[in-house]
Design a protein with these regions (language model features):
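Glycine-rich phosphate/diphosphate-binding loop of Rossmann-like nucleotide-binding domains
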Residues: 117-161
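Long amphipathic alpha-helical segments
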Residues: 1-84, 88, 94
């Protein structure tokens, strides 16, 4: 839900298209609606600029479908992360607009924002092909939040010349998300080459001493390159959220400056 939804209800009451009693029924579920197994945060977009997203892991397909049905009453689009094909089948039964991005393990309901809603551009860069599932979680989530996405995959430090060939594309981004496992060195390299904020995402890819992504996480936290923020292991979605907030704030500031000129 966003402020447009509430304004629309109030305008309908003002114009006589809707009664006060009908408006009350719609508004009384705010700021959240209790489904028993889930409490839907209807005001999250109003507070934070980002709608609530469903974390699919640990939820049954029926629970996910029920949450989607409820959220679609007040949200044009819904995103479900860490979702399997059984969850997708359940969601598709209640909403035919659902689509499944298998590599990202994401279900999209209601499509993606149109051009007028785009707030910025993000480059999603991976060290290796094995990092792509986490990168796709970041990329699809970023598209859901209204960002243009450039995907640059398999440009890790073992063949650094591959990165240099794509540097022009990376440098045009407002935010760069770097996804890397093993020793996680790519984030530091990119951080030393671009002027945009870098969001580093360590992945659990690697052999024994990578400790399921801990080595990459610690390497990224200890980076000597400036302007790098680090997400939790395999958290591509979190990187997209942060990138979206950065871009949305930049656009809001630009719009305000233009209005004051």
């Amino acid at each position: 839900m966003d402020d447009t939804y509430i304004k629309c209800i109030l305008q309908k009451v003002e114009s006589g298209e809707q009664s006060a009693a009908e408006a009350f029924e719609q508004l009384k579920v705010l700021p959240y609606e209790d489904l028993g197994y889930a409490k839907i945060d209807q005001h999250r977009n109003l507070r934070t600029g980002q709608t609530e997203v469903i974390f699919g892991q640990g939820k049954t397909p029926e629970q996910i479908a029920g949450i989607v049905t409820n959220m679609r009453k007040t949200n044009a689009r819904v995103l479900i992360t860490r979702a399997g094909e059984d969850a997708f089948a359940a969601v598709q039964r209640v909403d035919s607009s659902a689509e499944y991005r298998k590599q990202a393990r994401i279900i999209l309901v209601g499509g993606l924002p149109d051009e007028s809603e785009r707030t910025g551009r993000v480059a999603v860069v991976t060290a290796g092909t094995s990092d792509i599932p986490v990168a796709e979680e970041a990329a699809v989530s970023a598209e859901f939040f209204g960002l243009y996405v450039d995907r640059i995959f398999d440009v890790g430090v073992a063949g650094i010349h591959r990165l240099f060939d794509r540097l022009a594309v990376i440098r045009r981004a407002d935010v760069v998300i770097v996804v890397a496992g093993m020793e996680g060195a790519l984030a530091s390299v990119v951080g030393g080459l671009v002027d945009a904020p870098v969001i580093a995402v360590p992945t659990s890819v690697g052999y024994g001493a990578s400790f399921g992504g801990l080595s990459a996480l610690l390497a990224m936290l200890n980076s000597c390159a400036n302007g790098i923020g680090v997400m939790n292991i395999d958290n591509g979605y979190g990187a997209a959220c942060l990138a979206s907030k950065i871009c949305s704030k930049q656009r809001k500031n630009r719009d305000e400056n233009n209005a004051n000129e």
